[in-house]
């Protein structure tokens, strides 16, 4: 009997002749996120993924490559394992349908279902697509072609064994009715129910037209149909053959994460097979949407397939993982945009999260901290727990970033860089601990880095307890801002050359879009203060219209305080904040500097204009 403190999550098994891409990555990262979250909850977790290696399509591909099918697939598997490693995916087993234990499981299952009378011999005649390894009806075709591959359909008639799928129509409908969360999202549940209500045809489960597969135990001339073979992997992976403690511990699966294109097989055929075996169906089938690229379907002809290396080269592994689940409501179709990924990396990860970590770790290193009342995390944690249970992964991130926003507002209101209040600094450090733990299923690498800076473990114990007072060192930059993929990929090459090429004394040109990113405004210096231990810096309070900024400026050698107060100036306002001599500087005052650096003159508007006016 499965216990509540166990969690079993699976992906579909992937066709090995494909290249791992954003679609398969999305499914597998989703399963990894759920596995990691449940591990934090102290559950014993089993996460299964793998490859589907039998069938006519593989047999033909192996023939083209002049290799035996097993040798052919053996050479393909490393690219999947390498891809998942690059994405920090931590599975328990990578199952292959060519594994010896799986082939045994399939034959045992076939024998059991056959003995029950749910398999019979007949003839199958239909319209077959080798690419899909599936039959279609006339009405499902598009101009006589496969609706998926758009290739001509092959008319086949062959001896076949059939599974009595039609026998289980009422069982399925009753199960859907009693378990409304079995198929998610809900719109897909209604699609399946409507199709099942129309009636079910018995399923052809064997072929004689190819030899690469698992023979039927009761007729060696027939090879098991690939989907009947593939679905059984969910049982093999946790020890069905031995009916081991592992199997008893984890079955039924908590959730099969799949793409919407294979929902029928998982929500109809699979539970019917399990009914025949007297096994309970999985608790949930979650069918997510498809990814397009800049509004277009991914295809080799368009050369727009986002493979794993391209995905992580844009802004790094954690930014890619974050983007996929922040950008799209989990379950819906999504559109991949490199531009939007970079915007989210810069605006949300670098500006909001990265700056908070940098600012607070610097304050903690400079002033230390003193235990105080933590910033309230319990309401957020309660919502996050429920959203994880509902598989609303995008909303989990929304909640976490709402909390990050509230921490940034708290810091802005309390101004610990001015007050040096150790209790405020502690409250922020404690909040960062909570943020890192909640983000860890999505961004494991980043969370681990944060945990090392603030000295805590990624665990439920750390989440439920306040941060221990300890020495903290300033965090390294977690998210380097980027403009283009080329700039990011070639950053190491650029370090070896002159970073600021000079032509006739002028730096190399920038794109107009880069200029548009700058927010430069007219400001008025309202107050000038000394900074302890600073020989060159003044602390300036500058009005830029609707708000005031604290800016540190190296003007002490060139201006008296009285010369600066009341003076209009030009301020670069969207420069990332940084700590200077223990003071957070929130922008930059622009000045002209002579070549010998003996003269520094503040740039001011020629005529009077209101504070906050934009420089264009």
Residue ranges and their predicted role:
Residues 496-616:
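Phosphate-backbone binding interfaces of nucleic-acid-interacting proteins
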Residues 2-182:
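N-terminal, positively charged nucleic-acid-binding surface of large information/translation enzymes
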Residues 2-49, 101-105, 156-366, 370, ...:
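Structured secondary-structure scaffolds
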Residues 55, 232, 530:
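Short, glycine/acidic-enriched loop or turn micro-motifs at the edges of active sites
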Residues 284-287, 451, 539:
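Beta-strand segments within the central parallel beta-sheet cores of soluble alpha/beta enzyme folds
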Residues 447-514:
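Intrinsic disorder at enzyme termini
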Residues 266, 295, 400, 428, ...:
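Hydrophobic, well-ordered secondary-structure elements that form the walls
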Residues 121, 332, 341-376, 380-471, ...:
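Helix-rich, typically C-terminal accessory recognition domains appended to large enzymatic cores
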């Amino acid at each position: 009997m499965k216990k509540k403190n166990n969690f079993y999550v699976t992906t579909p098994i992937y066709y090995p002749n494909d290249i791992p891409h954003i679609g398969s990555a999305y499914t597998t990262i989703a399963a990894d996120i759920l596995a990691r979250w449940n591990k934090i909850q102290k559950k014993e977790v089993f996460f299964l993924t793998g490859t589907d290696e039998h069938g006519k399509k593989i047999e033909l591909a192996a023939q083209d490559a002049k290799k035996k099918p097993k040798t052919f697939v053996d050479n393909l598997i490393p690219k999947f394992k390498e891809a998942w490693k690059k994405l920090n995916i931590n599975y328990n087993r990578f199952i292959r349908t060519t594994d010896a234990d799986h082939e045994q499981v399939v034959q045992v299952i076939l024998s059991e279902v056959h003995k029950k009378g749910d398999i019979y011999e007949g003839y199958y005649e239909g319209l077959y697509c080798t690419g899909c390894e599936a039959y279609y009806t006339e009405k499902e075709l598009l101009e006589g072609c496969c609706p998926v591959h758009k290739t001509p359909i092959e008319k086949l008639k062959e001896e076949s064994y059939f599974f009595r799928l039609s026998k289980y129509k009422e069982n399925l409908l009753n199960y859907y009715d009693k378990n409304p969360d079995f198929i998610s999202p809900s719109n897909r549940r209604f699609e399946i129910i409507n199709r099942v209500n129309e009636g079910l045809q018995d399923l052809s489960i064997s072929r004689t037209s190819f030899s690469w597969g698992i023979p039927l135990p009761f007729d060696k001339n027939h090879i098991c149909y690939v989907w009947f073979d593939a679905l059984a992997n969910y049982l093999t992976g946790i020890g069905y053959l031995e009916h081991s403690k592992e199997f008893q511990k984890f079955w039924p699966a908590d959730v099969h994460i799949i793409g919407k294109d294979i929902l029928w097989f998982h929500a109809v055929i699979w539970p019917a097979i399990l009914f025949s075996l007297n096994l309970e169906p999985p608790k949930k089938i979650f069918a997510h949407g498809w990814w397009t690229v800049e509004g277009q379907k991914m295809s080799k002809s368009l050369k727009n397939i986002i493979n794993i290396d391209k995905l992580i080269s844009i802004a790094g592994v954690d930014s890619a993982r974050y983007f996929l689940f922040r950008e799209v409501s989990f379950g819906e179709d999504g559109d991949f945009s490199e531009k939007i990924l970079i915007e989210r990396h810069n605006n949300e990860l670098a500006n909001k999260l990265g700056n908070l970590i940098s600012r607070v770790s610097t304050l903690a290193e400079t002033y230390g901290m003193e235990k105080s009342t933590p910033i309230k995390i319990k309401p957020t944690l309660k919502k996050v727990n429920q959203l994880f249970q509902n598989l609303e992964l995008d909303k989990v991130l929304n909640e976490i970033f709402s909390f990050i926003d509230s921490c940034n507002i708290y810091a802005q209101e309390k101004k610990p860089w001015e007050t040096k209040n150790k209790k405020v600094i502690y409250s922020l450090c404690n909040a960062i601990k909570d943020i890192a733990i909640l983000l860890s299923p999505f961004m494991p690498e980043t969370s681990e880095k944060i945990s090392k800076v603030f000295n805590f473990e990624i665990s439920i114990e750390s989440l439920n307890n306040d941060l221990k007072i300890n020495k903290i060192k300033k965090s390294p930059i977690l998210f380097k801002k980027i403009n283009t993929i080329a700039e990011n990929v070639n950053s190491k090459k650029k370090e070896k050359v002159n970073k600021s090429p000079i032509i006739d004394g002028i730096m190399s040109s920038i794109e107009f879009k880069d200029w548009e990113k700058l927010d430069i405004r007219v400001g008025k210096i309202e107050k000038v203060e000394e900074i302890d231990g600073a020989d060159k810096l003044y602390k300036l309070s500058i009005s830029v219209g609707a708000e005031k900024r604290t800016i540190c400026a190296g003007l002490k050698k060139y201006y008296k305080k009285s010369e600066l107060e009341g003076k209009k100036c030009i301020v670069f306002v969207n420069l990332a904040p940084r700590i200077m001599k223990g003071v957070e500087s929130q922008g930059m005052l622009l000045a002209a500097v002579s070549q010998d650096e003996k003269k520094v003159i503040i740039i001011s508007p020629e005529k009077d204009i209101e504070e906050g006016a934009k420089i264009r």
